[in-house]
Regions:
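A glycine-rich (often HGG/GG-containing) alpha/beta subdomain
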Residues: 1-129
Length: 129
């Protein structure tokens, strides 16, 4: 299962960060940008599109973190877009269209990091505070 969520917090802001983690992450990035995956851990400017119509949603920064060298230990990406509600909702709506992709539960990225040995229990508990 691949999960995604707004990781920059709710509300309007200048920049919003959508995090994606799981086996479908690379597929999601390729379809949203109509390009190959960027170099690992390199901030790359990309146009982010509707997967059915290719209509532009926003232009933003993509950062790709291949497994196992990611926060969760899985393939993971961050998409940094403009922080308006319309952009965030449109992007989340597009990601939700992928099979085996679902909205993450609160704390689920940290849970994966703990389960995959990326952080210890003390660190996991401190993140929750």
């Amino acid at each position: 299962m691949t999960i995604y969520a707004l990781s920059s917090g709710p509300g309007v802001s200048g920049v919003a960060v959508i995090r994606i983690s799981g086996s479908e992450t690379s597929k999601v990035l390729k379809k949203l940008t109509n390009k190959e995956i960027p170099q690992p851990r390199m901030a790359t400017l990309r146009k982010i599109n509707n997967i059915n119509t290719s209509e532009l949603i926003d232009e933003g920064i993509i950062i790709w973190f291949p497994a196992p060298e990611s926060y969760t230990g899985e393939d993971m990406a961050e998409i940094h877009v403009h922080g308006g509600k319309a952009v965030v909702l449109a992007l989340q709506n597009e990601i939700s269209k992928f099979e085996n992709c679902r909205l993450a539960e609160a704390g689920e990225f940290t849970k994966l990091a703990f389960q995959n040995g990326k952080i210890n229990l003390l660190k996991a508990e401190s993140i929750a505070d």
